[in-house]
């Protein structure tokens, strides 16, 4: 296929020009010039004159912008058949963003002179196209457009024997559940455009790199959308030759970068994860076990934006309904890739992230909740919180949030700054404690001088925190992954005898002991309601951010009804099974 034929093929597939007649398309193709650019090349700098527009013939471009803070944000990808720069060309405005080749690419260029010549030949047809293009842009602005194209990954070993070949093979197996996969082994005889044919035939391309900065490794890197570095758990964290060389590639900042820490299959908990944080700009660090295909399936879902995050809200004993919902998700083979929670949801979620059986979680949680708490001088809080802290330390030991195969976070409220504080690192017991410290009832947990309490003050079901963790730091998009939120909080309005002018301690005590007096709220009721009113008022916003929002009918159970854990879990199970059946009839959630 010669360049003219390739240009025609691209134009026919174009969303902007595809509806034009063959005569106009042939004229347009004859006015195009072609250029080959290497991955990482900046082809249209922000602020430069808009003297041309580009069509992608092969490869791909990426639109990006530096924010005032200096952070890099990635926007649309421009793939074969698509164009970029038409708005600036038509309106004669400077470029509003950088456009960079993310792969070795062949581009067709329409210069301003050619554009004006074509307008004189076909004024009505082309003006109609350009007016529609401007209208669409003014109506919707610059948006991230979801497109179907082959996603590509390069698996790079950071040292000899890192296990990149096993990671690439296991990732290929996992991705085959989502589409067609081709796994490229290292090769030295590849032609410059050898990969173009695979773009249209496969959904996922995996390039297996070498532990050296060979020509194959560099070429594979340039073709990849995402980079997966691989190291053995416990390996040196020093920057090696291959990482240093790839870091010098002009397209390095544009790539989404991940780290896989490969562990022996018999490892009970990950090691070394926390020590890698902050050393590199990795989007995520994935501790994976050799031979555990479920770990690689989770990796595949994160890479492709199809991961499932489950958010567990607070609600005292009603939180046992979470166990029923989790059981239903497991039985329906729905993936749970990331767990987050607040208060009781954090306590259950942390144990679930430890891979404990659901029955064990219920029994451990019931024992934990049955312990009393000693009142203290009410200067900071009503109770000391020492028993809860002691038992959480016993429950989780020396585990940190990083020491989990399944990612987890606990949500708390930072009273010092008035924001949600996501606990996704450090001791696991401490993260759960901060999320289970209602303001006024328990003393706040201190973090570098700031006060952390139960997160329900701001958001009892921390969906926003989950959305941020399912998204990617570089890309501006909302749609990554699926969020299943479980809300077990029951809004009960506080009231007192309408004939009273003020609450009475003695009347409240009489009501507590069942003397027949009109029940008046006690300090525990007041503090609990005050701590949940913010989250309750934002429930509509929280629901809108979740893909599936479950509210098991647990109002009949008391906040402190921990002895009814089996009944509560069963209610959650039956409720979830009914709703999951409705989901699967519409849009099925991601399977494991």
What does each of the following model-derived ranges do?
Residues 292-339:
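Helix-rich "cap/lid" substructures immediately adjacent to catalytic or cofactor-binding pockets
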Residues 313, 335-354:
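Catalytic nucleophile loop
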């Amino acid at each position: 296929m010669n360049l003219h034929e390739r240009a025609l093929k691209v134009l026919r597939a174009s969303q902007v020009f595809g509806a034009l007649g063959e005569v106009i398309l042939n004229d347009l193709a004859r006015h195009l010039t072609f250029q080959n650019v290497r991955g990482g090349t900046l082809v249209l700098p922000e602020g430069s004159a808009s003297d041309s527009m580009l069509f992608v013939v092969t490869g791909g471009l990426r639109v990006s912008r530096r924010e005032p803070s200096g952070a890099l944000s990635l926007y649309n990808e421009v793939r074969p058949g698509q164009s970029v720069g038409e708005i600036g060309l038509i309106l004669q405005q400077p470029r509003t963003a950088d456009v960079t080749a993310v792969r070795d690419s062949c581009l067709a260029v329409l210069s301003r002179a050619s554009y004006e010549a074509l307008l004189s030949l076909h004024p009505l047809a082309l003006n109609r196209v350009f007016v529609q293009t401007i209208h669409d842009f003014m109506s919707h602005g610059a948006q991230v457009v979801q497109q179907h194209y082959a996603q590509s990954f390069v698996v790079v070993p950071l040292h000899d024997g890192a296990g990149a070949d096993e990671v690439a093979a296991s990732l290929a197996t996992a991705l085959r559940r989502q589409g067609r996969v081709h796994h490229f082994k290292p090769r030295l005889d590849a032609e410059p455009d050898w990969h173009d044919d695979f773009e249209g035939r496969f959904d996922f391309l995996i390039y297996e790199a070498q532990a050296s900065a060979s020509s194959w490794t560099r070429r594979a890197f340039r073709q990849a959308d995402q980079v997966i570095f691989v190291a053995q758990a416990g390996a040196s964290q020093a920057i090696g030759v291959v990482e240093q060389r790839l870091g010098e590639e002009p397209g390095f900042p544009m790539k989404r970068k991940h780290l896989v820490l490969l562990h022996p299959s018999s490892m009970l908990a990950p090691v070394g994860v926390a020590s890698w944080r902050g050393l590199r700009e990795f989007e995520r660090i994935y501790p994976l076990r050799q031979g555990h295909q479920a770990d690689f399936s989770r990796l595949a879902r994160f890479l492709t934006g199809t991961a499932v995050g489950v958010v567990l809200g607070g609600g005292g004993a009603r939180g046992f309904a979470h166990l029923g919902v989790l059981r239903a998700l497991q039985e329906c083979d729905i993936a749970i890739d990331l767990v987050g929670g607040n208060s009781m949801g954090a306590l259950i979620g942390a144990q679930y992230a430890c891979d404990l059986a659901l029955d064990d979680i219920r029994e451990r949680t019931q024992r934990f909740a049955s312990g009393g708490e000693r009142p203290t001088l009410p200067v900071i809080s009503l109770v000391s919180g020492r028993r809860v802290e002691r038992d959480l330390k016993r429950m989780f030991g020396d585990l940190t949030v990083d020491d989990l195969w399944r990612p987890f976070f606990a949500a708390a409220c930072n009273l010092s700054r008035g924001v949600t504080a996501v606990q996704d690192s450090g001791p696991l017991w401490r993260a759960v404690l901060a999320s289970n410290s209602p303001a006024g009832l328990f003393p706040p947990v201190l973090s570098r001088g700031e006060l952390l309490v139960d997160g329900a003050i701001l958001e009892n079901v921390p969906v926003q925190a989950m959305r941020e963790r399912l998204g990617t730091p570089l890309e501006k998009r909302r749609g990554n992954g699926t969020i299943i939120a479980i809300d077990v909080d029951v809004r009960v309005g506080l009231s007192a005898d309408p004939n009273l002018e003020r609450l009475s301690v003695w009347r409240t005590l009489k009501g507590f002991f069942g003397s027949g007096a009109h029940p008046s709220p006690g300090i525990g009721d007041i503090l609990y309601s005050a701590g949940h009113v913010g989250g309750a008022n934002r429930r509509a916003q929280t629901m809108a951010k979740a893909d599936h929002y479950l509210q098991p009918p647990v109002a009949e159970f008391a906040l402190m009804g921990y002895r009814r854990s089996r009944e509560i879990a069963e209610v959650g199970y039956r409720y979830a099974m009914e709703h999951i059946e409705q989901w699967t009839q519409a849009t099925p959630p991601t399977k494991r």
